[in-house]
């Protein structure tokens, strides 16, 4: 009962279904605050508390694992469905955070069934997601600063006018989708591999892992759609009239792009 209550509290802190409502509203905060909130601060507290509770609890009843993986799957699918109507880039990223944290809860839930690999992947994903989501939110903020809009339908031809922002957009989108060689690929792979290991003796877990793989592919397709719309081609009217990208922003983007690419193997080796 205590672990289930800890899990319930963790859902609230990490904006999982049914306690997700506060997070999309928080994206109205200034972009640096949103990047900190979604990347490294409040939303990560819940998953860290639950992970620590699992480590400290010893033998964890399987019911805790079942509740964790089932709610994670519901949240994962809900987060993806909420991608579809979004046109505001920051609001899309808010629902992306909800879905990405569900991967972490899924991996932690799998660890209850004996998968250390899934646990390691979940912990790695906390770090890897931080770099990718911080980059994506700061890219969105740069569009608001230079273009006066972050509405995706108005963003076309970004690479031609803002090559660094365009590359950052593409790298962050691929990272959120878990595409190699981006950092999140390595942590998602650990979670999925751990899930298949557990699923070898449990058909229900195997089905849930297959659904996770399908959701990951669908997420990639959705972000690929917006990459194909926003990045190539001639700049739209809003992009063509945009102000120059400040050098300080460009420097931060370059650093984060590098970290998104190299932090995956580093976090995996650090976790061991």
Give the ranges of each region predicted by the language model:
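Hydrophobic transmembrane alpha-helices and their helix-loop junctions in integral membrane proteins
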Residues: 1-229
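Cytoplasmic/organellar membrane-interface segments at the starts of transmembrane helices
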Residues: 159-167, 220-272
